[in-house]
Amino acid sequence: MDLFSSLPDEVLCHILSFLTTKEAALASVVSKRWRNQFALVPNLDIDEEGKREREEILLSFMDFVDNVLALQADSPIKKFSLKCKTGVHPRRLDAWARLGPVLPMLKTLIIDSAWIRCDTIETFLPTFPVLEELSMSINEWPDWDETVTSASLRKLSIFTIGCENFSNPKSISFDIPSLVYFEYYDMVAEDYPKVNLTSVVEARISLLLDQDQIKRGRAPNNDEDDVLLRLRNGWKLMSGIRNVQKLYISLDTLQVLSLCCKSMPVFNNLKLLSVKTAENEGWEGMPVLLRNCPHLETLVFEGLRHFVTNKCGDACDYVSREDKGRSLVSCPVKKLQIKGFRGTIRELEMIKHFLYSFRCLEKVEIYAEEKGRTRTDLEVPGMFELIARMLRLYNEFYSCDVQFLVRSSLDKKWTAQ
């Protein structure tokens, strides 16, 4: 250690910055000088890893966090990441989360815990005056009204763990005027009284519904359904991010939007829209969403599988109706990406429907699904070649460039064509 001890303080601090927080903490035991340099390390990353078969191991972890944070009392910490699962007492977690007064220079905060409640955000967020990035994997919102407010925050990610087992939050507001990136995964709230997110450029929204709510949404004559009426304020959240340029949504989010079609905001700045699909969920909100994106350039489908209902609207090829494709015809999208293509006839018919209806389309990129647990039609003998020929015909017949992109085990087969 004599060789290291002769190094300047700046060099020692730089060396410690390359170690994990646990390794740096162990090194700080060597001497008071090393301990002082550890307190100046700008990034803390504390991860509860491995098995915790004994209570003393858990207690040791909590004591370790307490000691590390105690060393940082006057430090210039800019990034703090804390990851812990079940077993840590909520009071201990709340104490760790309320670190604003002792970390005044903190710019990035990452919390991954199964037992932090979202009401903690409203309490501790104002204590971080220069915080720019916050990522939280948390337990649940309480039943009362909550407001997330920050003047400095530019990137916010909220993931509620296991929220499918909870009731819908009552009221959530966001007042973050400088936010440019917003990622939100939660049960849809009954109301969003204030959503000031006008600077958001990219948003990833996953508003979740339970199976009963999905079933009610598909039922005929559901306009007066009390359960659905409480979910129709989802448009307020979307209206708050109406200036977004890139929007990624889940199919549940699309179904929430189908409940408030008349209040759907117009996304004048939206250039890229990505929709994640699933076999058990429908496209009820797709038509009105596409009609409200007047400057859309790129449309991405993460899979084309969806649950066909009479409310899928004119965007769906499987429902026979006179106005089929009307929302697509009016959409100015130039580039279409289809991911997770499995080679089914239904998918090919949908692609044909898109090629016919999107009048401004210039390029279509179709990505074959990676080989997974279930066999796709692309792996059926002879089917790959048939699909390749059909897509070539699409490329020749329609006035746009259709590309079929494959990887892994199918790559050699496609290259040989």
Curated annotation (Swiss-Prot):
PROSITE patterns for the chain: FBOX
PANTHER family: F-BOX_RNI SUPERFAMILY PROTEIN, RNI-LIKE SUPERFAMILY PROTEIN
InterPro entries: F-box-like_dom_sf, F-box_AtFBL13-like, F-box_dom, FBD, FBL60-like, LRR_dom_sf
Signal peptide per UniProt: none
Pfam families: F-box (PF00646)
Record's protein name: Putative F-box protein At3g58950
Residue intervals of the F-box domain: 1-53
SUPFAM superfamilies named among the record's database cross-references: F-box domain (SSF81383), RNI-like (SSF52047)
Organism this protein belongs to: Arabidopsis thaliana (Mouse-ear cress)
Gene3D superfamilies: 1.20.1280.50, Ribonuclease Inhibitor
